[in-house]
A protein has these predicted regions:
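Bacterial Sec-dependent N-terminal signal peptides
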Residues: 1-30
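Von Willebrand factor
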Residues: 27-105, 110-164, 168-170
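Extracytoplasmic/secreted cell-surface and envelope-processing proteins
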Residues: 42-46, 96-98, 178-182, 240-244, ...
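Short beta-strand-loop
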Residues: 85-132, 183
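Flexible, glycine-rich surface segments
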Residues: 148-230, 234
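Von Willebrand factor type A / integrin I
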Residues: 197-292
Length: 292
């Protein structure tokens, strides 16, 4: 018979945190969503990296996210457990096997199902099933891009934001945004940004910020209230050549202006390059545990 987890034995039962943390009035229940960019950024031929392939870095980040999620359960009373974690794509892959694997990464932990076995399963699935997703995507070798703008426009409120939760969206991407079936422009705003876009707008020079602010470049704004959402963007991998020296700065500016415009608070947004997972682990844990 499954053993119901008694978190941190008697100590946590007596001293566990309340639903709303006393120090910063932040809901204690987590609702973590992961948006996975399965564009050609994971291609091991086009973007090969001898130290560690980028999809392998993603896997390390996912492992840290899952570990931070399950570890947070150990700081709470059993009766308070009502926490969620799930993974999304946009567009959804045509391969049904990938979509089935993503269903294995959706968990809702409550007082009725909490157990050490469940926590182990969450950590295991975010390692094994996630690896299978990447292997299948690499095998299919069909990259149509990632519709990050469209995900925010059509899905983020329904999928990633719930009342009474700390809503955290972790986005694994190289920072560029491109989906061939959603290429819109409104004056100097667009639904996409690529290295070519940056060069064509002359944002690859030292006065890039002045150009963005005076000519109003950026992602097309969305009329959304995301003040109850925290966004952690991981895996930024700017093009490294003489014509794109400022890509990281431009990408961060595009993302931050866009998210702040939808109400995401500055302290609830982080934009991190694709460092090795061992160096990212503490960053992820600190963001999720709110140790900033």
């Amino acid at each position: 018979m499954k053993k119901i987890l008694i978190l941190a034995v008697t100590v946590n039962l007596l001293c566990g945190s309340s639903f709303i943390t006393a120090q910063n009035n932040i809901p204690s229940n987590l609702n973590i969503s992961v948006l996975l960019d399965l564009s050609d950024r994971i291609d091991t031929i086009k973007y090969s990296n001898p130290s560690m392939e980028f999809y392998q870095r993603d896997l390390g980040y996912l492992k840290s996210v899952a570990k931070s999620f399950t570890s947070s359960m150990l700081t709470k009373r059993v009766m308070q457990l009502n926490d969620k974690i799930q993974l999304y794509f946009d567009p959804e892959p045509r391969n049904p096997e990938i979509n089935e694997l993503s269903n294995r990464l959706k968990f809702h932990v409550t007082k009725n199902n909490a157990s050490l076995e469940l926590f182990d399963k969450i950590n295991k699935e975010y390692t094994t099933s996630a690896l299978s997703i990447y292997k299948q995507a690499l095998k299919d070798d069909v990259y149509v891009g990632s519709d990050t703008w469209g995900f925010f426009r059509n899905k983020v409120k329904d999928y990633c934001v719930e009342e009474g939760y700390r809503n955290i969206l972790v986005i694994l991407t190289d920072g560029y945004v491109y989906y061939k079936n959603n290429l819109l422009t409104e004056v100097n705003f667009s639904t996409y940004i690529t290295p070519q876009t940056i060069r064509s707008k002359r944002l690859n020079q030292s006065n890039w910020k002045e150009i963005i602010e005076t000519k109003k470049h950026g992602f097309i704004p969305l009329d959304l209230d995301l003040s109850n959402l925290e966004v952690l963007v991981l895996g930024i991998n700017p093009v490294k050549n003489g014509n794109n020296k400022y890509d990281y700065d431009v990408l961060e500016k595009y993302w931050s202006d866009w998210l702040y415009g939808m109400g995401v608070k500055k302290e609830n947004f982080a934009f991190k390059t694709a460092v090795l997972p061992a160096n990212m682990d503490n960053i992820i844990n600190s963001f999720i545990s709110k140790k900033k």
